[in-house]
Amino acid sequence: MRELITGGNELVALAAIESGCRFFGGYPITPSSEIAHEMSVELPKIGGKFIQMEDEISGIAVALGASMTGVKAMTATSGPGISLKSEQIGYGFMAEIPLVVVDVMRGGPSTGLPTRVSQGDINQAKSPTHGDFCSIALCVGNLQEAYTQTIRAFNLAEKYMTPVFLLLDETIGHMHGKTLIPDFEDIKPTIYNREEFKGDPKDYQPYGVAQDKPAVLNPFFKGYKYHITGLHHGPSGFPTEDEKLSQNLIDRL
């Protein structure tokens, strides 16, 4: 075990990098800004990319785009940012794009209390956008879990090919203290990486999977052609109005 004296937001950033995250896109917002700061410092050291965008919407859009290339990606925000990101979150659910969305909760609704603690975004994480789908949301209860639950969030996002919410409140995000976290060598064997289709490109259908399986989206630029859309789609990803295909898609999501 490693003994560290650090903060909750900083532990989220550390765990993200040790999970294999190599892209962060976002926009600074209290009380999550320390995550963006840490990623901006540490990612360039290991060949990763950090982009601060002009707003919350573009912040998640670039993170989704990075994930489509096969890179593990993350964005971080607070409640008002989740409200702005909701359309793109829905796109991530529909297109089955893995992404970790960190929400360091503060008082709301609206601008609320930016520097005070609240835990009012749990229902928002369960149903962040319109339509029928299942959302995965993990809640952090202490400094150690800021690290371990971040690892878990990335593993779930990659396994189930979906956006995953990581929720912590302002107190844990800004809390500094001593905590024990697993050694990286112990964490390394538990890291999950998304599946890839290895067969003939002519046979590749990213959404042509069993009802209990997620899509298999090969990284862009590797010779496999497919379509990604927020519309209801068939096995190849192209839009469809076929009743059975649409219902099977929603049931699977």
Question: Where do the language-model regions lie?
Answer:
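A broad, structural surface signal
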Residues: 14, 18, 22, 37, ...
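Short, solvent-exposed polar/charged micro-motifs at secondary-structure junctions
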Residues: 62, 148, 176-177
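Flexible, low-complexity linker and terminal segments
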Residues: 2-8, 161-253
